């Protein structure tokens, strides 16, 4: 009888040890400070993207689905981390909202025509560059504007918190002209302002402008300030940044990145 009691006690002790070990493991998992481990536990990647930039991130009005090169790139990152390209949730952002949403932790990363600058590197960590562009200018085709200097004293529509204004200011200084600026939250708003005559020109990166080019408009030939696009993550999140960079490196090596760019008319 005593032998059975000892066996019972030992058995219960083993169960307790296993249970306790499991609880500690679960607790350790719950309190993990590794951002990538927390991300994997969450089971999906939350990404800030544009929904008003044809070819990069644009909401298809027929399907309601967000499409574009940066959408495909984000799915590739999700596949690298989770083994499933659909383990991703997209949140629309603008140039003004993308940084704050990343800071608060609502987003894991931002893939939204985000130009990498030395100033921005102080606030966020950026991936290796995946696309290079330059600032361009769109005007009405029936306007008298043929060159950048023709815009002296005129009003340019730009996006809030974008690098465009600073790039144009430098260009205007070099050209010896003065520009006025009107800032808008979204690109469609700037295009409407141009069409209605409230502004004289619409300026942003060339690839973005090209998505808004219609028969009634034209692009000036001048380009300003090279724009290097990178994926942004919260400052110090090196684990996620490494995963993003590994994804980009793999896509470049395999030729898939070029294929993606060609698919969306960016190459």
Where are the predicted features?
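Short, low-complexity disordered leader/linker segments with a strong preference
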Residues: 1-42
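Ligand-binding clefts/hinges and TM-proximal coupling segments of bilobed small-molecule sensing domains
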Residues: 30-34, 40-41, 163-182, 214-223, ...
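Extracytoplasmic small-molecule ligand-binding "clamshell" domains
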Residues: 32-33, 40-110
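Periplasmic-binding protein-like
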Residues: 51, 131-142, 206-249, 266-267
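Short helix-initiation/N-cap motifs at beta->coil->alpha
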Residues: 88-100, 143, 181-196, 227
